A protein has these predicted regions:
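Residue-centric detector for conserved, function-critical "anchor" positions
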Residues: 1-9, 14, 36, 298
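K/E-rich alpha-helical interaction surfaces of small helical-bundle regulatory domains
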Residues: 13-33, 52-55, 60, 264-282
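Mobile genetic element proteins and their domesticated derivatives, centered on retroelements
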Residues: 15-19, 26, 46, 62, ...
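Short loop/turn microsegments at loop-to-beta-strand junctions
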Residues: 152-155, 166
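RNase H-like two-metal-ion nuclease catalytic core shared by retroviral integrases
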Residues: 98-102, 200-202, 208-211, 224-244, ...
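C-terminal domain-tail junction helix/linker
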Residues: 216-220, 242-298
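Basic, flexible linker segments flanking DNA-binding modules
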Residues: 23-132, 229, 287-294
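Active-site beta-loop-alpha junctions of metal-dependent nucleic acid enzymes
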Residues: 146, 150, 169-191
Length: 298
């Protein structure tokens, strides 16, 4: 601001007259500049968080991170400062493609509550994805990652309580060995799973005898989505959507080989479990939330 820089050399009245600037406007601008200077620490912290998380965080998650760092700030201010600096979170791209089997299932959807509306003579189905503790409800699915060098398939297990990826397998083909390896890793990590509900869609691998037996031997109860209804497994679908939006869409051509893609997928899952905070988990990461609950003993 030229008037501010010259006021120490010349009378303010003369400078305001020459610049045709009202006194009230000058002091308003001066106050605004002073206010912006006070925001320097916050803005620097916002920039650090934004680039540390590779533009994956929007203003709400950045607000939670700032509060963790001791800043007293609300989401409205963070949104305003981010907008001023031109910092915007990655936005969802085209819907990802999730690999589906083509067999008919017979297992019931245990996450679906049937409510009869007698007054309006209709039946309403309400999905219930709430789990009060870890190892109460797990979900799984398979999703495809396609680049010029080929395809990789990700098969993870998601705990619906703390949204943690319990185990996963990355394979060049969606075969049962992939599913078996995923289960073995989860079962080695968690020993007491009796009564756990394990939900999936109607993919062919979840209808195999070997899959049924593996769950039954652990006392696990199987649940399956209704045919052709992806919303019945939306927590798992949402994870795939977040993952692809934050590390895959727009970056496909940066992966020169399947090995590079697999490393990026593994790094993201590690990041998701241990660094990426979730607003519904009170601003904690999945692992932090588990460690603060009884899940740590399971």
């Amino acid at each position: 601001m030229v008037v501010y820089e010259l006021q120490h050399k010349y009378p303010l009245v003369i400078l305001l007259n020459i610049s045709n600037l009202k006194k009230s406007t000058y002091y308003y601008t001066l106050k605004k500049l002073d206010k912006d200077t006070k925001n320097d620490d916050i803005m620097n912290a916002i920039i650090d968080i934004y680039y540390t998380h590779k533009a994956r965080y929007g203003y709400r998650r950045i607000t939670l991170e700032l509060i963790k760092r001791g800043f007293k700030v609300n989401h409205k201010k963070v949104k305003r400062l981010m907008s001023r600096m031109g910092l915007y979170a990655l936005t969802p791209k085209a819907k990802y493609k999730s690999y589906k089997g083509d067999m008919n299932g017979t297992v019931k959807n245990l996450l679906l509550n049937k409510v009869v509306d007698e007054e309006n003579h209709k039946t309403i189905y309400k999905r219930n994805f709430n789990a009060t503790s870890c190892n109460e409800i797990w979900s799984t699915d398979v999703s495809e990652f396609h680049i010029g060098a080929g395809k990789l398939y990700l098969s993870p297990i998601l705990d619906l309580h703390n949204r943690e990826i319990i185990s996963y397998n990355i394979s060049k083909s969606p075969n049962f060995e992939q599913t078996k390896d995923m289960l073995d890793k989860a079962f080695n990590k968690h020993k007491h799973l009796e009564g756990l509900i394990f939900h999936s869609d109607q993919g062919w691998q979840y209808q195999m005898y070997e899959y049924h037996k593996a769950l039954r031997d652990k006392g696990i109860i199987q649940s399956m989505s209704r045919k052709g209804n992806c919303l019945d497994n939306s927590p798992m679908e949402n994870f795939f959507g977040k993952m692809k939006n934050e590390m895959f869409y727009g970056f496909e051509y940066t992966f020169k080989s399947l090995d590079e893609l697999q490393k990026a997928m593994e790094d993201y899952i590690e990041y998701y479990n241990n660094q990426r905070i979730i607003t519904k988990l009170k601003g904690l990461t999945p692992v932090e939330y588990r460690n603060q609950s009884l899940c740590a003993n399971l």
